[in-house]
Amino acid sequence: MKMKKLVKSSVASSIALLLLSNTVDAAQHITPVSEKKVDDKITLYKTTATSDNDKLNISQILTFNFIKDKSYDKDTLVLKAAGNINSGYKKPNPKDYNYSQFYWGGKYNVSVSSESNDAVNVVDYAPKNQNEEFQVQQTLGYSYGGDINISNGLSGGLNGSKSFSETINYKQESYRTTIDRKTNHKSIGWGVEAHKIMNNGWGPYGRDSYDPTYGNELFLGGRQSSSNAGQNFLPTHQMPLLARGNFNPEFISVLSHKQNDTKKSKIKVTYQREMDRYTNQWNRLHWVGNNYKNQNTVTFTSTYEVDWQNHTVKLIGTDSKETNPGV
C-alpha cells in the first residue's frame, strides 16, 4: 500500500514538473480584440498574440489586423511578425592555446504560411525584395476596395486615401534580407543573413569567404598574433550585433480570405536561428580561420486558428526543434 502511494506521488510530481517545464519553455498570451471604425466603409479589428520559448530564447509578438471592408468582397488580415531571436553566441575559451572556436548567429529565418485550403492566400508582404540597408523601414498602406501599397520609410508617403497603415522597422548591420525561394500564394519567408562584415578595416567578409592561405578571416584577430587561440579573435564588441546579441524582426504578411468560404483557418508562424561555428588554428607559420555554416539550428513554430467571422485568434499549438543540441 505504501509503495502504491509512493508511486502515485512520484507520478503526480513528475507530471507537475513536466507541466511547469512546458510553461516555462513556452508562454503564451492573447489580448482582447479592439474594434475601430476607420470610416463609413472600413472597420479594423486588432489583437496581439505573444508566444515565447525561454529555452530557445525566441519570442514571437504577432499583431493581427483584421480589415472589414464593405467595398471589398474578401476579408483582409495584415499580420505583423515581431519579437526577438537571440543569436546563441557563445564566447571562446580564452585559455585555448593553438586552436579555439565559438558559435555565433549566422542567419535568421521568419516565415508565415496558410495551412488551409484555397480560401486563404498570401497576397502581399513587406519587405518584398532583397534589402542590404543598415535599417529597414517600410510602410504598408490599405485603402478601400482591397488596394495595398508598400513604400520605403515609416510614413510611406501615405495620403488621405489610405484607411490603414502598418510599419516595419528593424536593424541589420552587416546583414542582408532575402526572400525565401519557396515563397508562393500560401507561404512567405524571409532570411536575414551575415553578408558584409568588416574586420579592422579588412573585408568585407561573409559566411563563405575563403582565402587559400588564411582561410576565412571573418573574425580572425591577427595572422601573426602572439596571443593564445582563445584570445585571437575579433573583440566581441566589434562584432555585428546580430552575430553576438539579438535580432528583432519586423515583417508583414497580408492574407486574403473568401468571405463565403470556411469561417476558420490555420496560420503557422516560424522563427529560426542558424548558428555557425568559427574557428582559428595555428599552423606553425600563421593563424588560419574557418567558418562552418549552420552547425546548430533552432526552430520555434506557433500555429493559430483564425476566426474570420469573429476576428479572433487562438493558439492551438507550438513546436520547437534543435539540431545538435548542447553545442
Swiss-Prot record:
Keywords: Cytolysis, Hemolysis, Secreted, Signal, Toxin, Virulence
Any single GO CC term annotated in Swiss-Prot or TrEMBL for this entry: extracellular region
InterPro entries named in the record: Bi-component_toxin_staph, Leukocidin/Hemolysin_toxin, Leukocidin/porin_MspA_sf
Location in or out of the cell: Secreted
Signal sequence segment: 1-26
Pfam families from the UniProt entry: Leukocidin
Principal localisation: secreted
GO biological process, one term: cytolysis in another organism
Gene Ontology molecular function terms on file: toxin activity
Domain of life: Bacteria
NCBIfam families: hlyII
Entry function: Part of a bi-component leucotoxin that acts by forming pores in the membrane of the target cells. The activity of LukEv-LukDv to rabbit leukocytes is similar to that of the Panton-Valentine leucocidin (PVL). LukEv-LukDv is hemolytic to rabbit red blood cells although the activity is only 8% of gamma-hemolysin.
Family to which this protein belongs: Belongs to the aerolysin family.
Assembly notes: Toxicity requires sequential binding and synergistic association of a class S and a class F component which form heterooligomeric complexes. LukEv (class S) associates with LukDv (class F).
Protein name from the UniProt record: Leucotoxin LukDv
